[in-house]
């Protein structure tokens, strides 16, 4: 298999994880399980895009068919209380991109965005920019807008940064060093 020979048999020090993004309607996650399993068995942590354009069922597919620790977006998990509980139970991290969610009309406005609910339910989340040039945003702007429009406190933003670093695919030394910088902030 080309994937195994390119990624697993010839590792590169800058390749630290495996993931898949794109239009969730264009593929089924189950079809990609073999590639994800090869990556996971080789020690690569995995992430996948789910629950942005499709409903909670795409997130269920992600956590049931793939060895993932993170989900790109995952915002439609808010529509399924059992799924929210499962995300907490499995400590699945959601890579939240409020700016793109609003630009794509997944949520009508800041008040309807589920980020505050995810935080209150104890779901691990991070703030992300998705596609900065396309959505005219940055990670910094996502933090500013989350504070301004969703009343996310500085302490909660700091905790989001800690959750992001904890869920990152960085090595333990890098994680520890960066988490200490966040704590000292």
Where are these regions (language model features)?
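Short beta-alpha connecting loops at secondary-structure transitions
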Residues: 98-104, 126-129, 144-149
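Mid-to-C-terminal alpha-helical segments outside catalytic/metal-binding sites
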Residues: 151-185
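Acidic, His- and aromatic-enriched active-site or binding-groove loops in soluble protein domains
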Residues: 6-17
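Short, small-residue-biased leader/transition segments that mark boundaries at the very start
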Residues: 1-2
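Flexible glycine/proline-rich, aromatic-decorated loop/lid segments
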Residues: 110-120, 134-136, 142
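Short acidic/histidine-rich active-site segments
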Residues: 47-53, 123-138
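Short acidic (Asp/Glu) and glycine-rich catalytic loops that position anionic groups and cofactors
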Residues: 67, 94-96, 121-126, 139-144
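Active-site core of metal-dependent hydrolases
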Residues: 17-29, 35-106
């Amino acid at each position: 298999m080309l994937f195994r020979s390119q990624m697993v048999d010839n590792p590169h020090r800058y390749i630290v994880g495996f993931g898949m993004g794109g239009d969730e309607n264009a593929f089924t996650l189950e079809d990609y399980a073999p590639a994800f399993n090869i990556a996971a068995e080789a020690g690569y942590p995995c992430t996948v895009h789910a629950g942005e354009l499709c409903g909670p069922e795409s997130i269920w597919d992600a956590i049931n068919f793939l060895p993932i620790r993170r989900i790109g977006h995952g915002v439609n998990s808010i529509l399924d209380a059992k799924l929210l509980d499962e995300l907490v139970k499995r400590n699945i991290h959601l890579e939240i991109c409020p700016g793109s969610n609003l630009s794509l009309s997944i949520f009508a406005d800041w008040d309807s965005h589920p980020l505050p609910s995810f935080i209150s339910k104890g779901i691990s989340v991070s703030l992300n920019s998705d596609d900065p040039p396309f959505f005219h945003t940055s990670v910094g702007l996502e933090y500013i807008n989350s504070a301004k429009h969703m009343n996310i406190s500085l302490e909660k933003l700091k905790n989001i940064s800690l959750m992001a670093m904890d869920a990152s695919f960085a090595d333990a030394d890098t994680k520890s060093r960066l988490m200490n910088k966040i704590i000292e902030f």
